[in-house]
Amino acid sequence: MAYGFYAPIGEYETESVTLPGGASVRVESPDNIGYGFWTHQAQGAVAWYPWEDKRMAVTTVLTHEIHSDKEDFDLTPGRNLTLNWGISQYLPLKKDNSLLLEVGPAGYDSWQVSDDEGSDATSDAHDQVHAVGGQLGVTHVPWNLVVNLHYFYEFAAKDRFQGQAFGISIAKKF
């Protein structure tokens, strides 16, 4: 089990826009790089190794996100549940197994599991998105260091953006 949070950092501004007919509404600025709210998350992970030598791993990570009130709006975004999954095949790059190549499919499924709340909540729709892709990485066993590259293609998005994602993960065990 793990706990994490996202702080509302990065530029986040709102602006007033006048609609045809004279009504004025507050909207998010189009050049924001922040979300304008805190997120707390609880996370649990499971790994299964089909062989004793652990040359393959089947992993899942379940994350539950709880969001705070959105800055400058009467809106609390609904909670999200995300399932990340992957299969990693480890291939030795050195005969002594000190350097391993990791390759395999990966993906995620994310669902909004509660309603947005507040007078600025404009839709009863719950967002969701699904993604499939792959991962490629290197593990340096003596240093307990892992570097992974990920690519995901999103599909079946509802009430949110859909696209492609690239990422890098660096992990070091101390």
Spans of model-derived segments:
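Outer membrane beta-barrel transmembrane domains
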Residues: D72-F174
